Amino acid sequence: MSALSTKLEPTNSYSESLPPQRRSPLEAEGRYRWNRGNYSITRRRIDIWGFVLTLLYQFWLNGKKWSYAGGYTEEKLQQRRRRQAKWIRENLLSLGPTFIKVGQLFSTRSDLFPAEYVEELSKLQDEVPAFSYEQAAGIIEEELGKPIAKLYRSFDPVPLAAASLGQVHKAQLHTGEDVVVKVQRPGLKKLFTIDLAILKKIAQYFQNHPKWGRGRDWNGIYEECCKILWQETDYLREGRSADTFRRNFRGEDWVKVPRVYWRYTSTQILTLEYLPGIKISHYDALEAAGLERKELAQLGARAYLFQLLNHGFFHADPHPGNLAVSPEAGELIFYDFGMMGEITPDTKNKLMDTLFGVAEKNAERIVNSLVALGALKETEDMGPIRRSVQFLLDNFMDKPFEEQSITKISDDLYEIAYDQPFRFPATFTFVMRAFSTLEGVGKGLDPDFNFMAVAQPFALQIMNNSNGFNPAGNIMDELGRQAVQVGNSALGLPRRIEDSLDRLDRGDIRVRVRSTETDRLLRRMGTMQMGTNYVLFTCALVLSATLLFVNNYFMAAAVVLLMSLVPAFALWRLLKRLERQDRMF
């Protein structure tokens, strides 16, 4: 089996995305147990469950104030979470492809995890060794049914990039076209099958957990992860996504998308047009090529708004490794179409209803649209959720436009979601993640870049076209819209009254009249009375132990002193309960 090495251009974004130590075909020498052909399934279970149970112990420890040296503070909790987040990221890397991808998916789920974990998971990049050229060639020949020499005029044995799911080689077809060949990692589907079976048990454990299962659909999250992971192993699907993406930008000369060579593509092999470019985060190279960084930042934002608003089909992983710029014309080049998002027309309409609610600062409309989207679970009392949304609106809308940040908005939204029954669909989190990542890329190119400022004209145009909001202040249109809204509310009122009465009949709604302040004071007085009893009991035992000790009854004194620890511990528990009650009111 022969192969001809080809000299790689320095502007190739695939090679630039690799750390220096990985720009050669690193052999998988058993550094990771999952990478061995004969790894033990039992050992795999031990590795995964060991990680999960250790993580749960750390979560439990976070809530224990005695575990903080020098006393608990919010700052110490954040510092501990940051350390834990790094530990989580390192362990996900060592657990291999399945958990690297799960970690990357969880980096979009700030509604599930604290901000410190999500921030660290967003840095999670594939750091696994490349597999050998012999393995890659064997997979290509088995999938395409021909020897390497008959398929390609030349094939570089040194991968341009290696990741958890596969690696990319440069090659040249016999017809003269330069291509990149993406080869799936050997044994990947077997590993996914084992890992996902274990993850199913973990999801069930979390679902039944008294704290972590409350208000969370872990089984649904597991199913979502399964779907996305298996989709990423199908390179035919990725090829179709690349084709659709290329078609959507066909009339735009400022974006380039690689062409798929279907004759050289299968479920485990993807052959794409070779489009070299300057990595979008290599600022010195961009300036040396005479490209304007500020314009590139605007171009990236424009490309994503075009994807989302014009076609509803968008690239869900726009990190700098997947974006490059052609040095000649400054065109934006997209790579890697394994993770794509799609918004259906119905979802788009519901999202627009949310946007209208934001424009009107109408928390009621936003909450109703989020319920319709399936992003919010309807509860008996939606009042706290409406107040949380209204608080976010008041803080967001009252700021000058240039101070608004898509990252800050999504962080605030996720902070509310973390304590409320939100369950953001994957598409929503992909959109927020893509926009947040893109804002980071834009600020790297231009420190003054503001994604919201770029998005404003697009949003206003769509709202005008939808007749949902008229910033120009056309009074008659606005009155007509308000009349329709009032009419809809009036028509829906009998149904809402009937629903409320039905819920009263079923006992789902309980009406209770009480004095909250009086109840609180009575509870506090009862607790303090009990605390006084514990203090007296403890003091009596300590005094008894002291008298016994003075009279040389050392053993009896030790026993009585140990007995005094029981009411002392009960007193400590009582004081903690009082502290919690004070925080609640």
Curated annotation (Swiss-Prot):
InterPro entries reported for this sequence: ABC1_dom (IPR004147), Kinase-like_dom_sf (IPR011009), Prot_kinase_dom (IPR000719), UbiB_kinase (IPR050154)
A family per Pfam: ABC1
Signal sequence annotation: none
Region described as Disordered: spans on this chain: 1-23
Regions of compositional bias (Polar residues) in chain numbering: 1-18
Superkingdom, natural source: Bacteria
SUPFAM superfamilies in the record: Protein kinase-like (PK-like) (SSF56112)
GO MF annotations, alphabetized: ATP binding; protein kinase activity
Family statement drawn from the similarity comment of this UniProt entry: Belongs to the protein kinase superfamily. ADCK protein kinase family.
Protein name: Uncharacterized protein sll1770
